[in-house]
């Protein structure tokens, strides 16, 4: 799980890549959970939270660049 400070230190291209990776990871984890193949529900939660952090920071940057 990444800290917001670590995410803020990433550049925009890295942030976009991180978002893509986390979306893929959450999708794969969701499929595995649906198939009953994973017992690690915390991994899914951590991935979703990291994705939320990335999206929040992207939104902050967009808002600050517009205003």
Model-inferred region functions:
Residues 1-67:
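Extended, charge-rich alpha-helical interface modules
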């Amino acid at each position: 799980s990444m800290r917001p400070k670590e995410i803020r230190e990433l550049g925009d291209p890295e942030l976009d890549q991180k978002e893509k990776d986390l979306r893929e990871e959450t999708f794969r984890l969701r499929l595995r959970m649906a198939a009953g193949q994973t017992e690690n529900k915390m991994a899914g939660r951590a991935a979703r939270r990291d994705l939320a952090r990335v999206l929040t920071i992207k939104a902050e940057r967009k808002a600050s660049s517009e205003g």
